[in-house]
Design a protein with these regions (language model features):
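Conserved catalytic or regulatory cores that recognize and/or transform ribose-phosphate-containing ligands
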Residues: 1-115
Length: 115
């Protein structure tokens, strides 16, 4: 099984990085291949185009996509859109609080429930 992890990269906090690393370690110990953009995508890209292209390939190749959602991560929103367009199964890694009305938080929670 292959999993792509949507997550903050540039502005991820140390605490977020630790939660993501613990999640990745658990999956990899279980024999699951994890594509982790901070590790597996070359982040030296002056425009971000190649990063988005590499992440798209990782998402296409994944059996399912996991998300560590941080609403401040704009790159995560781009990856989320690609994942949605490809109709991939989505699993949430961290706690997401529902909001009143329409929001990405509510959409992600709904998406995961739909399986």
């Amino acid at each position: 099984m292959k999993i792509f992890l949507i997550c903050p990269v540039r502005n991820a906090t140390d605490e977020q990085k630790q939660v993501m690393q613990d999640h990745i370690t658990g999956l990899e110990k279980a024999g699951i291949t994890v594509y982790y953009p901070a590790r597996d995508t070359n982040q030296s890209d002056p425009t971000g185009y190649q990063i988005c292209s590499d992440n798209l390939k990782g998402i296409i190749d994944a059996d399912e996509v996991h998300i560590f959602y941080d609403p401040k991560s704009t790159g995560s929103l781009f990856d989320l859109g690609m994942t949605f367009a490809l109709k991939k199964l989505l699993r949430i890694v961290n706690e997401i609080e529902p909001t009143e009305g329409k929001s990405f938080s509510n959409m992600i929670l709904d998406w995961e429930k739909r399986g």
